[in-house]
Structure formats: C-alpha cells, structure tokens
Regions:
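Generic N-terminal amphipathic, Lys/Arg-enriched alpha-helix
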Residues: 1-19
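Residue-level recognition of alpha-helical structural elements
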Residues: 3, 22-25, 102
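Hydrophobic packing residues in well-ordered alpha-helices of helical domains and bundles
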Residues: 7, 26-29, 51
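Generic secondary-structure signature for well-ordered alpha-helical cores
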Residues: 16-23, 63, 160-168
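A short, well-structured juxtamembrane/interface segment
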Residues: 19-35
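Glycine-rich phosphate-binding loops that contact phosphosugars or nucleotide phosphates
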Residues: 38-153, 159-162
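A short, charged, Gly/Pro-tolerant segment at domain boundaries
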Residues: 163-181
Length: 181
C-alpha cells in the first residue's frame, strides 16, 4: 500500500507541474529546434541526464544534436541553438556556457522552474516548466526531483509533438537509433 501512495505522490506532483505549464511551448520549442543549424544540450547533474534523454530522441527525430561536455562535442557557432536545462537558471557552469554561446551568436533556450534568472535574462526563449510556487518542498521527492522528472515528461511531450507534426514513423526513428550497443 505504501508503494502505491509513493507512486501516486510522484505522478500527482508531476501532473500538477505539467498542468501549470504553458501549452504553447511545444509549438514554440519545435520552431526553435527546426530553425537551428545544430542543437547543443547542456545541464548539470541530473538535469544533464534529462538532457541526454532529450538529445537522444532529437537524434532519432533527425536533428543534428550534441551534448555539451562530451569529448566529441564540436564548437558552437552562430545559427546554432543551445538548450540549457537548469531548475534555478543560476548554475555557474551553465551561465558560462550561455555567455560563450551568446558571444559567438548562438541562440539560447532555457528550460527552468523559474521565469526569471541569470541564464533566462540572456536567453532567447525561456520555457518555465510549471510555476515556481509549485516547487515547494515535497517529502519523498528530495532536492530537484520534482523539476527533473517534470522536465523529462515535458521534453518527452515535445518529442511526441515533433513526431506527430512531422509524421515521423517509428521505423525511421529506429533506423537512427544506435546500433553499436
């Protein structure tokens, strides 16, 4: 019984956050992704792991994507898009990435729990997942768990939107999936 209560707590909180997220974001994010020459994904800690999920699905969708910090990541240039995932929008390393990307003329998107932040002030687009007041302390969901899981679901919904809008068959996505595993 206790396990079911925990599952309902997690699912309920994620649903609450996603219900409070602007429904126009899917279209706006898709437009920004489509207009980019290349896409770079950055985050720190568990937010970076969420970014890895998103990067993989974007590759399956046919986008040219790199994850910041990997040894094979190329340099970002004008016309590229840097997608930053940061609950606070204040992570020092991600602020530095944002400044460097801005300096070369890349566009910046911030996915965050906050509408206003240092990174958000430099970004070309801010996608606030939920509303700040919904991120209070939740017993059983420590530290950034609520943001990370909500963002993972939000980004999966973006991928679903892209697949639907572009009519990408799963077979095509499978062909783009890694085959050296």
């Amino acid at each position: 019984m206790f396990q079911q209560q925990n599952q309902q707590l997690v699912i309920g909180k994620i649903s609450e956050i996603l219900d409070a997220t602007d429904s126009s974001y899917a279209e706006k994010m898709t437009e920004m992704l489509d207009s980019a020459k290349r896409i770079f994904i950055a985050g720190a800690g568990r937010s970076k792991l969420v970014g890895n999920f998103f990067a993989m699905r974007l590759v399956h969708g046919g986008y040219d994507v790199s994850v910041v910090g990997e040894i094979v990541t190329p340099s970002i240039k004008a016309g590229d898009l840097l997608v930053i995932i940061s609950g606070s929008g204040e992570t020092e390393q991600l602020i530095a990435f944002t400044k460097n990307a801005k300096k070369v003329g890349a566009n910046i998107v911030l996915i965050s729990s906050r509408a206003s932040s240092t990174i958000g002030d430099m970004a070309d687009g801010v996608f606030q997942v939920g509303k700040q007041e919904l991120y209070g302390k939740v017993v059983g969901m420590p530290m950034g768990t609520v943001f990370e899981l909500s963002t993972l679901c939000f980004l999966e919904a973006i991928i679903s939107h892209i697949i639907w809008e572009k009519g990408i068959p799963e077979e095509v996505m499978r062909e783009r999936h890694a085959n050296l595993e």
